[in-house]
Amino acid sequence: MAVVEKKLWPEFFTEVLRGKRRVEIRLADFEIKKGDTFVVREWDPKIKEYTGREVKFKVKKVIKIPEDLIGFYPLHLIKKHGLYVMDLER
C-alpha cells in the first residue's frame, strides 16, 4: 500500500484534529486507492513552512468525480485530472 502526503492549511487541519473532517476532496493529480495511507501535514501559508504537525489516515474509499464539477480548483485542472473524494479513518 502506498503512502501519500499532502499539505493542509491550519484552519482545515484543526477540523481534522477535532474529528470534524473525515472526507477529503483533492485534485486527482496523484494516484491513491483504498487501503493506502493518506497523510495530511499542516502547512502555514503565511511563513511558507510546515508546522511539524501531521495526521495519518487509512483510505476507506476513493471516488473520482467527473471533470465537469466546478468548485475549489481551476476548471482547466479539474478537466485535466478530475477530483478525488476520499473517506478517511484514523
Give the positions of each predicted feature.
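Short, basic/aromatic beta-hairpin or loop at an interaction surface
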Residues: 2-22
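A structural micro-motif recognizing beta-strand termini
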Residues: 26-29, 89-90
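Short, charged beta-turn/beta-strand-edge "cap" motif at the junction between a beta-strand
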Residues: 29, 43-48
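Short beta-strand-centered aromatic/proline hotspots
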Residues: 48-62
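Glycine- and charge-enriched low-complexity intrinsically disordered segments
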Residues: 62-90
